[in-house]
A protein has these predicted regions:
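Extended recognition/assembly regions associated with phosphoester-bond processing machinery
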Residues: 2-327
Length: 327
């Protein structure tokens, strides 16, 4: 668990938590957040964390029946986890939570909300691809991982998932990338992917990464590590932050996007994306990060500001994209 420190004064900011692979460990994640909330209230007197973002392998498993059968995972590794407690109402998620899908999901559940929707009170799935607002932050994301042989196929899978469909259902598709690329003129604050963007390791401490993960070396050398569609979206959308998971390690990078184009950026500062990948939930692992993110003041004013204005809302421009590309 890592924190970005005390908040800066004079700016409208939101305190958020970012999680790598959740693997069904919701109780442990929420407990870690509450512990950090308590510590920061005592130290800084600031309000609590407003939002939890999960970067895939969320495992919204409701039962040990159909949901178990739809997970691409050896049977000996299947665990019910704690999500079912939040689904049944036994527990309530203590803060708004948004997530994307990974490659180990209860696909039978996520298929029901594949365009985005609530999987439990206060827990929102962004869908195969999606864009929403939350309290002055525009958040976009794309679920799944890249596999070349499925990229240009349609989404033909439907429950009950059998055979290859158990895996292909979570593979990234060209249609989702095309739809998201139509939002390139909009300003993205946060973008989520389970798979890392291809080539992102070149913009961080790649040598340190390869010391810790020696088996990455060949894939990095041959350009096979990461998702080419995510790399394309990183270049097109240029979000302020990009969060990922999947590879079970922490890695940070700052990706430049070329010189500024006046008058859009009169300060002369080069536009960059701050990339962060996080680990899975295990003791002494870097699975959770807390940070302050500056929000759009005009959007905060539109939603009423304060805690009351911090709720999920549709992005009208994304809805227009979906309408224009639906057939």
């Amino acid at each position: 668990v890592h924190c970005s420190g005390a908040r800066k004064k004079g700016r409208e900011e939101m305190w958020i938590a970012v999680q790598g692979c959740a693997h069904g460990e919701l109780e442990a994640i929420y407990d870690a957040i509450e512990e950090t909330n308590k510590r920061h209230r005592e130290q800084f007197g600031q309000e609590g964390i407003a939002l939890l973002i999960c970067c895939g392998d969320f495992q919204s498993i409701r039962n040990a029946g159909a949901d178990f059968e739809s997970i691409s995972c050896p049977r000996k590794y299947r665990q019910l986890g704690s999500f079912h407690k939040y689904y049944s109402g036994e527990k309530l998620a203590p803060l708004p939570t948004i997530f994307i899908g990974g490659n180990h999901e209860a696909s039978s559940h996520l298929f029901e909300v594949r365009h985005g929707g609530w999987v439990a009170p206060n827990i929102y799935f962004l869908g195969h691809a999606g864009v929403v607002w939350f309290g002055g932050l525009r958040i976009g994301g794309m679920s799944g991982i890249y596999k070349r042989f499925d990229y240009h196929t349609g989404r033909y899978e439907a429950p009950p998932f059998q055979g290859d469909a158990v895996r292909s259902v979570y593979h990234q598709r060209y249609l989702d990338v095309f739809r998201l690329s139509l939002m390139a003129k909009e300003k993205f604050d946060v973008f989520l992917s389970h798979d890392w963007p291809k080539g992102v390791t070149a913009y961080g401490d790649e040598a340190d990464l390869l010391r810790k993960k020696k088996h990455f070396r060949d894939d990095v050398r041959t350009g096979q590590l990461g998702s080419p569609p995510c790399e394309e979206l990183l270049r097109r959308l240029q979000p302020r932050y990009w969060f990922s998971a999947h590879l079970h390690c922490k890695f940070a990078a700052i990706v430049p996007h070329g010189p500024p184009v006046p008058p859009e950026n009169p300060t002369g500062e080069q536009k960059v994306t701050k990339f962060l990948a996080l680990d899975k939930v295990l003791p002494n692992r870097h699975f959770l990060q807390f940070l302050d993110v500056e929000v759009h003041e005009e959007e905060v004013k539109r939603t009423g500001g304060g805690v009351e204005g911090r709720h999920f809302s549709y992005d009208p421009k994304w809805l227009a994209v979906l309408k224009a590309t639906h057939s």
